């Protein structure tokens, strides 16, 4: 399918700069407008990216602020990158080394002689201010907002086998590979492989992907993917609770995807949770002496507060919202808007003592039944878990309204998060949806009819080898990574 001109997302930009210089950037990126897609849950949909005056100004402001932060860092990361220490403000040889080193990493190619000469002209500012770092700061600011840094400019030659395809050049392959596995731009070792022309070899790409898989950047990258996929990116909770919940879920992904290389969909089925004493107390579970993996309620992330809090409405849980999130994100179902005469801004009708099973009766309305039979059957199965995951046997404030935790998913009756997770983690429908969401994230756009063969191949790959790491490494070695539609 189509490969468009993709701009780095704020997360990719910040993570790439942090990996290169060791200097944090995320707090400076908060004012950079992010593309908001209504068709996929991810922040890298290039079909929603647009250039505006406000974006250009925000990126310029960011580049200036970040460059100042880098040169102020006592560790002198730029000098370490260039391998030289300036003898004075006019040290041209050292500054040209800085230009070549920083330019190569940010633009993913060697700078031409005339480019190095042009950027070396910035030394006049260093001489004027008697400060070598004045030129370095201007250089970093210029390169950070350079189009070749901010955009994935994929170039190549027409394919001899298929004139409709381009065979990507080595630098473009390196960029694709690095962003696929880690969400950051290529490191020095990957650029060296590209410069040696070795990335056309699938076995080399797979080996490089396996190396990158072991980095902290890869773990953070795929945690972000899952957070956006399942909808809990940016929790609006008290900071301490948010940190505890986020750590629990991060530990789940680290264990399933990285440490134990388990089945990908075990994220919905793991029976243990990583709990601190404080989080165990919050959930109403026996507290370990220190943070540890302990038996919990099952269902993997389905019983985590990170996921559950999304289903809060009207001061309590909403079976409809929870079920809708599962149906749309985990089963890739589509829900249309409610009828225009339905009031969604007020709680479902019913007396003060009415139980939810009575009040959530929209399935009895013909115009609403099609959606609510699906969403409410899913959501009621998680009702034993409160807004942020506390166990309860009855509805809040209604002790007579006991909760049995029964629900229905994919025509199967289940009780509670453990049984729901067992259903979802083994369902072909979830395998297909998971690979669809992965495709959307990797290619940076919604799927199109022309992508069906690729989607089928991804789903078949997961069905055959259900480990997430293997799916990613297979993508890295695949012909699709080194080609694009002309």
Model regions: which residues?
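Periplasmic c-type cytochrome electron-transfer domains
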Residues: 1-68, 72-73, 79-83, 101-109, ...
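Extended, non-catalytic structural segments that build the interaction scaffolds
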Residues: 1-8, 86-88, 150, 154-175, ...
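C-type cytochrome heme c attachment motif
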Residues: 15, 19, 228, 364-373, ...
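Short, solvent-exposed loop/turn and secondary-structure capping segments
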Residues: 19, 28-32, 115, 150-156, ...
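Short, functional "switch" segments adjacent to catalytic/cofactor/reactive centers
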Residues: 35, 40, 45-100, 385-435
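A cross-family structural signal marking well-folded subdomains
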Residues: 47, 144, 174, 180-181, ...
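A conserved hydrophobic secondary-structure block that centers on an alpha-helix together
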Residues: 86-139, 160
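Sequence context surrounding c-type heme c attachment/ligation sites in exported
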Residues: 280, 294-431, 442, 449, ...
């Amino acid at each position: 399918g189509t490969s468009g001109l993709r701009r780095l997302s704020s997360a990719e930009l910040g993570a790439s700069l942090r990996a290169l210089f060791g200097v944090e950037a995320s707090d400076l990126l908060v004012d950079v407008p992010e593309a908001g897609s209504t068709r996929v849950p991810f922040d890298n949909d290039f079909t929603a990216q647009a250039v505006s005056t406000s974006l250009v100004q925000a990126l310029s402001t960011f580049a200036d602020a970040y460059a100042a932060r880098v040169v102020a860092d006592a560790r002198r990361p730029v000098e370490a990158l260039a391998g030289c220490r300036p003898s004075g403000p006019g040290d041209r040889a050292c500054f040209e080394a800085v230009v070549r080193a920083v330019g190569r990493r940010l633009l993913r190619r060697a700078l031409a002689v005339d480019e190095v000469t042009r950027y070396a002209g910035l030394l006049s500012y260093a001489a004027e201010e008697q400060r070598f770092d004045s030129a370095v700061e201007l250089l970093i600011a210029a390169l950070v907002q350079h189009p070749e840094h901010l955009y994935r400019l994929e170039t190549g030659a027409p394919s001899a086998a298929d004139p409709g395809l381009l065979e990507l050049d080595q630098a473009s392959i390196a960029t694709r590979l690095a962003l696929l596995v880690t969400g950051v731009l290529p490191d020095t070792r990957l650029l060296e492989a590209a410069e040696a022309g070795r990335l056309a070899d699938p076995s080399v790409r797979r080996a490089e992907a396996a190396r990158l898989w072991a980095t902290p950047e890869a773990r953070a990258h795929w945690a972000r993917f899952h957070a956006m996929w399942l909808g809990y990116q940016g929790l609006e909770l008290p900071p301490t609770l948010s940190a505890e919940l986020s750590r629990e879920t991060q530990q789940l992904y680290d264990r399933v995807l990285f440490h134990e290389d388990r089945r990908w969909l075990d994220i919905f089925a793991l029976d243990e949770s990583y709990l601190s004493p404080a989080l165990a107390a919050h959930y109403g579970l026996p507290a370990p002496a220190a943070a540890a993996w302990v038996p919990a309620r099952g269902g993997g992330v389905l019983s985590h507060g990170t996921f559950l809090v999304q289903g809060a409405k009207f001061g309590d849980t909403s079976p409809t919202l929870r079920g809708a999130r599962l149906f749309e994100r985990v089963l890739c179902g589509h829900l249309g808007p409610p009828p225009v005469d339905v009031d969604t801004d007020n709680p479902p009708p019913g007396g003060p003592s009415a139980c939810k099973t009575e009040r959530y009766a929209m399935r009895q309305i013909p115009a609403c039944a099609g959606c609510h039979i699906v969403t409410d059957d899913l959501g009621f199965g998680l009702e034993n878990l409160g807004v942020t995951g506390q166990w309860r046997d009855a509805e809040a404030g209604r002790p007579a309204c006991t909760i049995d935790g029964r629900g229905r998913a994919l025509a199967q009756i289940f009780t509670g998060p453990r049984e729901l997770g067992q259903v979802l983690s083994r369902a072909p429908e979830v395998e297909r949806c998971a690979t669809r969401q992965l495709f959307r994230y990797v290619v940076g756009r919604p799927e199109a009819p022309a992508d069906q063969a690729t989607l089928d191949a991804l789903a078949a790959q997961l069905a055959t080898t259900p480990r997430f790491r293997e799916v990613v490494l297979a993508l890295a070695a695949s012909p699709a990574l080194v080609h694009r539609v002309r």
